[in-house]
Amino acid sequence: MATELTVQSERAFQKQPHIFTNPKAKANKKTKRWYKDVGLGFKTPKAAIEGSYIDKKCPFAGTVSIRGKILTGTVVSTKMHRTIIIRRDYLHYVPKYNRYEKRHKNVAAHVSPAFRVEEGDVVTVGQCRPISKTVRFNVLKVSAGASRSKKFSKF
């Protein structure tokens, strides 16, 4: 995932829609920041409260609400900007052979700059309104991935 170097990296001026940025304000005052609690037992990360990033698609500091399904999966790809691909494994029953077969689905999810996500991490995502053509989920919690010894590796 690309790291956020500066807040003002886009062509348009980036600001939170709920906060008035007064150019005449004293420089020593702490800047105001708007954030919210998404509910459902998920804590707002410290980076969302104290950070300086601007992300309108963030569930904690943006305008997106979480409703619907809550899913868990393993991060497979972090190559896109602020978007990850998670893999959800499941078993499908085949009645003819009276056995189960392994299957998986890939789900694209928006990841807020409040989280540092790497491949192999286990993330919990919540459903939100469609953010783009394929993205309908938002990362709510990041858990550390499985240790290297437990994972499959060639050597």
From Swiss-Prot:
Q: Which GO terms describe its cellular component?
A: cytosolic small ribosomal subunit
Which domain of life does the UniProt lineage start with? Answer: Eukaryota
PROSITE patterns for the chain: RIBOSOMAL_S17
Q: Which Gene3D superfamilies match?
A: 2.40.50.1000
Q: Which residues form the signal peptide?
A: none
According to the UniProt entry, its GO molecular function terms are: structural constituent of ribosome
Q: Which UniProt keywords apply?
A: Cytoplasm, Ribonucleoprotein, Ribosomal protein
**Gene Ontology biological process terms in this record:** translation
Q: Name one Pfam family in it.
A: Ribosomal_S17
Q: Where in the cell is it found?
A: Cytoplasm
Name the major location: cytoplasm
Family named by the database record:
Belongs to the universal ribosomal protein uS17 family.
Partners and quaternary state? Answer: Component of the small ribosomal subunit. Mature ribosomes consist of a small (40S) and a large (60S) subunit. The 40S subunit contains about 32 different proteins and 1 molecule of RNA (18S). The 60S subunit contains 45 different proteins and 3 molecules of RNA (25S, 5.8S and 5S).
User: What is the documented function of this protein?
Assistant: Component of the ribosome, a large ribonucleoprotein complex responsible for the synthesis of proteins in the cell. The small ribosomal subunit (SSU) binds messenger RNAs (mRNAs) and translates the encoded message by selecting cognate aminoacyl-transfer RNA (tRNA) molecules. The large subunit (LSU) contains the ribosomal catalytic site termed the peptidyl transferase center (PTC), which catalyzes the formation of peptide bonds, thereby polymerizing the amino acids delivered by tRNAs into a polypeptide chain.
Official protein name in the record: Small ribosomal subunit protein uS17
Q: Which classification does the entry list for the species?
A: Eukaryota, Fungi, Dikarya, Ascomycota, Saccharomycotina
